Amino acid sequence: MAAAKPGELMGICSSYQAVMPHFVCLADEFPQPVRPAKLSKGKGRLRRPRQSRFKTQPVTFDEIQEVEEEGVSPMEEEKAKKSFLQSLECLRRSTQSLSLQREQLSSCKLRNSLDSSDSDSAL
């Protein structure tokens, strides 16, 4: 009996060209996917130059003004202004009440800390 190489005893193929019998069944169990002959759609197409994608039409200042002036009635403008002022007032009140709550909380904490220090000194 010929001496086997250490790698062959463990079932490891020592030569890249030799195929061990137990590896043949793996090829049947897990076949390699067949590659398509064509390239996929995304890679086969020629791309447009990106520079043209970012170009825009020139716009004059007069055109912008016309767009802003169209369709805005004075009544809608007044409603928007009133709504904006109302939301500002609501925001002001909420921040004011929050600051009052903070002041009350900090004064309450200060009072409690002073009370506890007084009781400690009384002992």
From Swiss-Prot:
It is found in: Cytoplasm. Its main location: cytoplasm. Signal peptide: none annotated. The modification Phosphothreonine is found at T56. Highly expressed in the kidney (at protein level). The modification Phosphoserine is found at S73, S87, S97, S113, S119. Keywords: Cytoplasm, Phosphoprotein. The keyword Lipoprotein does not apply. It comes from the Eukaryota. This is Uncharacterized protein C11orf96 homolog. It comes from Felis catus.
